[in-house]
């Protein structure tokens, strides 16, 4: 479960609730832990995050968040040009927390230094960061050429051109991670929603801020796989790998998830023609998606209610 930049007490409460959900178990998809996306960013490429709530990196603060998460804090995203960033990266990595770099104006060398210090990769590559340039490759260039950097991609047909998806496949191959970056409007009708403290609007499935910038997506992970195949001409096996085994390897849990193998947990989808979903199994039990229809209700449309800091 991914958080969004919010006041620190809300983030603390959310990490606690996610930890409770991991411990008690939830119906449907398996909750593996939390992905802290914010508040350790910089303003230039803030996206839909509220820069007034950005914070400086502080080891005692990170330790408190880890304690509240009770071992379920899986990933922390941060901007690599922040003060004390290398110390923070080393601290998090030493505590088995992955560090992803994004929402940042960092240059190539700063990004490479963070990756060399143990950072894991880039948050939604190309989005929320300095663009690739032939005289300053920036974060994107560093991520593409670093041999161990994992690169997240939002393959929804809006965040990235199909040619960029192909470029990433050519350069990074098995280091690509398909993500949705989906927010609460996913699966819902067009209308106004809240993302953190920001009011956003969805039209034809595309979510934008009042200023016109993209604000997350309404993508599904299966839709991302389908788009990689149909829009970017990526082989199906490669696209499935980007949504299954590659993320499991990035998180260090490929010994039990991410592929079908003796001794691994039986989480799988059965797909039909045009990659249409037919069956779902979680931990070996078939799941009926119809049981979760109450989750997709008009109650998620914004009528002035406060948004949870989960995306």
PLM ranges: what are they?
Residues 1-14, 29-43, 69-81, 97-100, ...:
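Divalent metal-dependent hydrolysis catalytic cores, especially in the metallo-beta-lactamase
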Residues 1-63, 84-93, 112:
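Active-site loop-helix segments enriched in His/Asp/Glu that coordinate
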Residues 249, 259-298, 303, 307-311:
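C-terminal cap of metal-dependent C-N hydrolases
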Residues 138-151, 169-271:
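His/Asp/Glu-enriched, well-ordered alpha-helical/loop segment
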Residues 42-70, 112-125, 129, 136-150, ...:
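Active-site gating loops and adjacent loop-to-helix segments of metal-dependent hydrolytic enzymes
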Residues 36, 92, 122, 228, ...:
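Conserved, mostly hydrophobic/aromatic
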Residues 80-91, 108-109, 132-140:
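Active-site-adjacent beta->alpha loops and helix N-cap segments on the catalytic face
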Residues 7-8, 51-52, 82-83, 107-108, ...:
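Short, small-residue-enriched loops and turns at beta-alpha junctions
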């Amino acid at each position: 479960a991914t958080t969004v930049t919010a006041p620190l007490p809300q983030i603390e409460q959310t990490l606690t609730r996610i930890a409770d959900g991991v411990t008690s178990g939830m119906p449907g998809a398996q909750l593996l832990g939390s992905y802290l996306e914010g508040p350790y960013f910089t303003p230039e490429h803030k996206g839909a995050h509220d820069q007034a709530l950005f914070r400086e990196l502080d080891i005692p603060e990170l330790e408190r968040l880890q304690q509240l998460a009770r071992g379920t804090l899986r990933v922390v995203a941060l901007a690599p040009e922040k003060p004390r960033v290398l110390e923070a990266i080393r601290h998090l990595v030493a505590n088995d927390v992955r560090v992803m770099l994004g929402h940042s104006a960092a240059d190539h060398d700063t990004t490479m230094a963070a990756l060399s210090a143990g950072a894991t990769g880039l948050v939604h590559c190309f989005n929320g960061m300095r663009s690739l340039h032939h005289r300053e490759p920036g974060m994107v260039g560093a991520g593409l050429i670093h041999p161990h950097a994992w690169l997240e991609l939002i393959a929804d047909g809006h965040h990235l051109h199909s040619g960029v998806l192909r470029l990433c496949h050519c350069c990074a191959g098995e280091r690509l991670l398909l993500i949705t970056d989906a927010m609460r409007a996913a699966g819902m009708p067009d209308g106004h929603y809240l993302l953190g403290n920001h009011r956003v609007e969805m039209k034809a499935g595309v979510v934008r801020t009042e200023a016109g910038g993209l604000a997350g997506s309404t993508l599904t992970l299966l839709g991302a796989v389908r788009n990689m195949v149909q829009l970017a001409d990526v082989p199906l096996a490669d696209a499935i790998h980007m949504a299954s085994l590659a993320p499991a390897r990035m998180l260090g849990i490929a010994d039990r998830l991410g592929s079908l193998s003796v001794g691994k947990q039986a989480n799988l989808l059965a797909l039909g023609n045009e990659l249409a979903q037919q069956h779902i199994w979680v931990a070996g039990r078939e799941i009926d998606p119809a049981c979760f229809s109450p989750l997709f209700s008009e109650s998620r449309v914004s009528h002035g209610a406060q948004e949870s800091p989960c995306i």
